[in-house]
Design a protein with these regions (language model features):
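Basic/aromatic-rich interaction segments and small domains that mediate binding to polyanionic partners
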Residues: 343-355
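Short beta-strand-centered aromatic/proline hotspots
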Residues: 331-340
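Acidic/His-rich, divalent-metal-binding segments that scaffold phosphate/diphosphate chemistry
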Residues: 69-214, 227-230
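Glycine- and charge-enriched low-complexity intrinsically disordered segments
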Residues: 354-370
């Protein structure tokens, strides 16, 4: 809670370059508070009144002590990217379309699980394409998806997110339009088999028992069985069955090697893991994109298709070029150059102009993207 008549630091409204809602030192009026509520600004940095107290009536301001500068604190720095995204008109439009898609997916899953032998693929695809088109740039897409985590049921939001990410990958691969659309639906339907898993197992807050984990691992087969007889592209069916297979044969349910795994399933596997790792889990906070890139770099090239994974990681890392980040020692800096051989460890520049190559200074790493 805040009260009027205090000073504050920058408050941004998310636009392509960021629009300032209020400059540092602006008096915090009731009108401004209401404006920030409208833009869903979750927190602000408040100046200590001793730094910028208003002059009293009749006071000779010329003789007044020079106002001390407002110290730039971590609170000032961390007007978070989440707040900037959620403050935007674009986000509110995206949010409405996202919820429309979620309802469409929920309805589709319900009908398929009830035994219906067809679904309105065209309407579902149109809704997802409309949502995808409203995102703009790649970074805006990832920003928007991150901010939708708590809006809908985790299963349906995950399926939608994976559909959107697979769609981006398909376009990066310069696939034919019809193939991109099929890949999108494959991403959306990939986890439909989880509808057959009891909620108390699927959403269990504690560690799963061996029996429960074995049941979870059956969801690809459950999903394939649900859509086997639908009049849809066979690649969608294989994606539901194979998205947990891995190129080295370590996946499930059939321990297939790379020669037997459908390309759409391999693309969906990458999107699936990325979305899962950047989501909060009961045992950890959501990982930042560079932590996910690091994880893929350390073990991903034996498990995932190298062509698809390299493309995804390069595009993802490039998305954050010039972005402001925080290191594990709480210092803030900007990414100035990517290391092509280790994308998770770019070269960064601090506010004093000094440069740090994270690939050669391995005690430091990117902890969060601002």
């Amino acid at each position: 809670d805040v009260a009027p008549s205090r000073g504050l630091g920058d408050v941004y409204k998310r636009q392509p370059l960021g629009q300032i809602l209020a400059l540092p030192g602006t008096p915090l009026t009731r009108q401004l508070i209401n404006k920030m509520k409208l833009y869903k600004v979750g927190s602000i940095s408040i100046q200590n009144p001793s730094y910028a107290a208003a002059p009293q009536a009749g006071e000779n301001t010329a003789k007044r002590d020079k106002v001390k500068p407002v110290p730039k604190t971590r609170a000032h720095e961390m007007v978070t990217n989440i707040q900037r995204v959620q403050a935007s008109e674009e986000f509110r439009g995206f949010q409405l379309k996202y919820i429309t898609c979620i309802n469409q997916i929920k309805d589709t899953f319900g009908k398929i699980c009830a035994g219906e032998k067809s679904f309105d693929e065209a309407t579902l695809l149109t809704a997802v394409i409309d949502l995808s088109s409203s995102c703009g740039t790649t970074i805006e897409t990832f920003d928007m998806l991150y901010n939708m985590r708590t809006i809908a049921d985790p299963l349906y939001s995950h399926c939608l997110n994976v559909g959107l990410i697979t769609r981006m990958i398909g376009r990066w691969l310069h696939m034919e339009k019809t193939d991109v659309n099929t890949l999108t639906i494959a991403g959306v339907l990939h986890d439909i088999g989880k509808c057959k898993i009891p909620d108390d197992v699927l959403n269990k807050p504690d560690k799963l028992t061996d029996e429960e984990f074995a049941l979870i691992k059956k969801h690809p087969q459950f999903g394939f069985d649900l859509i086997r007889d639908l009049q849809i592209d066979s690649r969608i069916k294989r994606t539901a069955l194979m998205h947990h297979e891995r190129c080295d044969g370590s996946g499930y349910p059939s321990q297939l090697d790379s020669s037997l795994i459908d390309d759409f399933a391999m693309i969906t596997a990458i999107a699936d893991v990325y979305d899962a790792m950047t989501a909060a889990r009961r045992y950890r906070a959501p990982l930042c994109p560079f932590a996910v890139i690091s994880s893929f770099e350390s073990e991903g090239f034996t498990k995932y298709n190298t062509k698809f994974l390299l493309l995804f990681l390069k595009k993802l890392a490039t998305t954050y070029q010039s972005n402001r980040v925080m290191l594990n020692d709480s210092r803030f800096c900007n990414i100035v150059m990517l290391n092509p051989h280790e994308l998770s460890r770019p070269i960064v520049r601090f506010d004093d102009g000094s440069i740090l190559d994270l690939s050669t200074n391995r005690e430091f790493f990117i902890k969060s993207v601002m």
